[in-house]
Each structure stands twice: as C-alpha cells, then as structure tokens.
Amino acid sequence: MKRKGYFIILAVSLFMFLGNAEALEVASLMKDGKEVKYEDIDEAILSAQDKDIITLLSDVSPTKTFYKSLTFKGNFTITYNVYGWRYKSDLTLDGSHLVINSKEGMKKADNGEAPTWASMVLGGNLTAINGGSITFSYDSNKGVMNAIYADNKATINVIDNAKFKIEGLNTSGKAGQGIQLDMTAGSGIFVKNNSSFLIDGANRGYVNSPTVYVENSNFTVQNCTANASNGGLFEAKNSKINFLNNAGHGLSTGILKVSNNSVVNATNNAYYGITSTNEITVDDSSTIISNENGYGFIGGGIRLGTSGKLNKSVGNIASGAKVTLKGNKSNALENYGQFKFAENVSLEITENKDKSNGAGIFNAGTLTLPSKAIVQNNHADNYGGGIYNKGTVNAINSALYNNHAGKAGDDIYNVTDALFNFSKTSIDWNLDDCDHLIDDWYLDTEEKRYNVHDEENYFVQKYDKALETRENIALKAAHNLLGKVIVKYVDEEGNELISSIEMTGSLDDNYETESKEIPNYELVSIPLNSKGVYQKEDITVMYVYKKVSSVFEEQIPPTGENFKLSYPIFALISLIVLAGVFILKKRI
C-alpha cells in the first residue's frame, strides 16, 4: 500500500516537472524541416540563420541584440531594455510584438558601438504585419534623444491591422526626434490596411523629408515639444491623419496629397497646422481641418509655398471637399503659390487672429476662392482683417464680411498693383455689431475709418469704383446711416383716412412714394416731397384728399324735413283727383 502511494507521488512529481519543462520553452525554430524548441530566447536568436522565422511561445526579454534579418511570429511580446542598437537588416513582427525601452534600467546594445543618443540606429527595415506591433519608449533625461536614427533606404512598414508607436519622455528643450533620417533616398513610412502609427511626446516627430504613405489607416503625431514633422511627400487615402498639440509645425510637407474620404486634422500646433512648400492636392471626398494653430512666433492654419518662390507651388482643392480654418492665432490661410479652391468647395475661415495683416487670408500668390466661401469674424491688428492681398485674389460671391482690422480694411486690404476681384455685397448680410443690413462696400482707410454711429467721428463713403481693381483699397462691407420717410393719407382737416406707411433707406439714397385710391375721396395734389433722398431727420410726406359725392348719393330720395313738407301736398293733390273722379261719375 505504501509502495503504491510512493508511485502516485512520483507520477505527480514527474507530471509537474514535465509541465514546468514545457513552460520553459519560449521559442521555436525550423531546423532541417523539424521544429526545434528553445528555453532561452538568446539561444534561439543565436541559432537562427539570416531570414529565419522564430515562433514565440511566451513573452521574452533577450539580453543580446543582433544584426541578422529575422521574423518573429506568435502573439507574444519580445522586450529589450537597451539603447544604441545598430541594426542594418530586416526585422519583421508577424503577429508578434516588439518593445524597446530606453529609459530607467536600460543597458547598451552589444552589437558594435552603442550611441547613447538613440534607441536604434536603423539601416534596414522594421515591419509589423498581421496584428503585430512595434513600440519604442525613451527618456531624454537618460541621454536618449532619438527613438530611431535611420540611415539611407531605411523603411518602416505597418501593414494589416498592425501598430507602430514611439513614446518620448522628458524631451522638451532637448534636441532629438522620434525618427531622424540621415538620408532620405529610398526611405519611407508606409501604413496600410487598418493599421495605426503614433508618435507621442518626442521633441520632433519625424524629420528630414521621408515619404509617408497612409492607406485605410490612422496616422497621428501629437504632443511633440518641437516640430511634429519636416518635409517629404505625405499621401493619405481613406485615412484619418492627426497632428495635434505639437509645440512647432503640425504637418510639414513638400507635397501633400489627400484622397478617398480622408480626414486631415491639424489642431493646436504652435506654428503652422499644415505647411507645404510645393503642392497641396485634396480630392472631392476629403476633409481638411486646421484649427487653433499659430500661437508661437510664426504659424497659422495652412501655408502654401514660400515668400522666396512666388507662384511656384500649386494647390488644388476639388469641388466637394471641405476645408475648415478656425480659431488660429495667425493667418488662417497664407498663400505664396497658385492656390485654387474649386466651385462647391465648402470653405470656412472664421474667428482667426493675426498680430499683423490678413487674419483670415494673407495672399502674396494667386488665390481663387469658391462661391459662398465664408470669411468672417477674423481680426488683424493692422490691415485686412478678412483678406490682405499683395498678389491676385478672386473672391467672387464670397461671404466676406464682419471682419475687423486695427488700422484699415476690416474686410479687404489690397496693396497697390495687386489684383483684387470681388462682388457686390449680398442683401442678406448684416453687421454683427449693430445687426443692421449691409448694403454696400464702404471706404475704411487708415486716415478715415468707416464710422456710422459716432457723430464726432462720423465717416461714411461708399466705394464707387470697379470691383476688379489694382488700386490700394481698404474696404468694409457695411451700411449707410438709415433715414426714415413717413407717408400719411389724410382729409382736408388732417384726419387720417388709412394707415400711414414707414419707409427706411440709406442716407442719400433715393426714395419715392405714391398716392392711394380711397373711396369717396380724391387727391387734392401730389406733395412736393413725394420723391427725394433719405436724410438724417425723418421726412413726412402728406397726401391730402377731399370728399366727393357719388352718383348713388344724387339718386337717393329726399329725406328729413323736405320729405315731411311734400307729404301733405301729395295728399291734397290725391284728394282733388279723387273728388274730380267722383263728380264725373255723378254726371254720367
């Protein structure tokens, strides 16, 4: 019986030992067609040949870095606590997860010279596919300034439900970036098929002009302590692009292409939300949002081109696209190129401010706005609250009003020889400070600001020149002081016969009144002031009528005393006639 008990205990112990032995197997490799399992991940990596596939069987933390090209499979995580890893091959996470921590507790990589200023010096490719992920986390207080320092032809691929993330800690005031490209030829970042890319908290996000291609995915750079990006080609198809809360530029490109229902959101960046030196192209299905940017020493919503290369860059926003530029602390739209917004683009430029000129739009290139573009409630400290133009602007039928400028040109400021083409004001526009309907364009110059409600500083003068001009003009969409005409219809004693009419219009505009047909009355004469011009004082126009008898009144039988007098006479005559008839009958 005791012996049987010993056998049971031995069997249980052996089972537990075998179970623990199996649990210690952390990875496997195929060797000569057979699967070989390893209890030590460093041993598995060392045994692997270039381009081998290692299947992870558990989460692992290697102690040694490597050069060779490897693919890791299995839904487990491989974690390195290192800095200065020099890698020149192709590393693929196929459903697996790579984490590289370069912060407290990190050790230098052991394959060659290990620079402290980077987590990885990349000369090859990093790829996450099929739900795999790659994460870099670094602390600049520990001397690590870059997550990735990339050499020529280095690429990052994030494909098929994969994720890529760089997290920077304590980066403010420390030169460095999430991704630094030494040379850009052949390098790029490619994010496709329901994948995501995130740089969060780096000093600069990515720099030195890589190609970035995002399709059916999300791409975000946020909370950087300097520029989020720098140059290159950026193309988005059916994707959501976010550049948020960065202390420098948001999306900085050489060429920007947005299509297939993509949304680009650049919000709360210290410099420009979006800036492109060469090209901006947006198709009819996509949306651009660039709000609340430009709170640094430069910046704004969108900038196309550079002041040194006027009309060399090109912008095309297709009909149906939506562009919103709101609440920026500098020019909402700054254009040095040839920028065209097609008809039926939804363009809203509102509530922007600038310490100089052109809070809504500063244009030095050639700019065409769509009909019904909204440019309103923008405030410039100097000139051109709505638009400041020193190039060519076509703003036909744009809703350009209720903007403000500190010195001149609340809505429009056009410098000499610049071309400005615009339209008459619309009858449904009204001023925001008095709620009066806008009736025309008025001069709003530095010497004499438009002012209709202050008698001491009263100045109201309509702009009466061409709506296509190369002259220096400063204009405001506004209204004249309103005059009132009261039209009354009275009899000769001054009694009102019908209700009076009130008419209002701008001072010095013409007015014209008319008489009314009133039963049993006829007009005595047409008043001398039946026509005239509106004045500051109210004008009363009096139409006087006299009463007349109608044909019906002349045919009515007499009444009253006359009728009482004729009744006895009629009766007497009737008696005489009857008496005559009676006498005649007697004789017969």
What are these regions (language model features)?
Residues 443, 451, 479-550:
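Extracellular modular ligand-binding repeats in secreted and cell-surface proteins
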Residues 1-7:
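Bacterial N-terminal signal peptides that target proteins for export
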Residues 559-572:
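Juxtamembrane/start-of-transmembrane alpha-helix segments at the extracytoplasmic/lumenal side
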Residues 23-46, 51, 300, 319-321, ...:
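Extracellular/surface-exposed low-complexity segments
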Residues 572-588:
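C-terminal membrane-anchoring or membrane-association module
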Residues 75-90, 104-123, 133-155, 163-254, ...:
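Extracellular beta-strand/beta-solenoid scaffold signature
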Residues 8-17:
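Bacterial N-terminal signal peptides
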Residues 53-86:
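N-terminal extracellular ligand-recognition/capping segment immediately after the signal peptide
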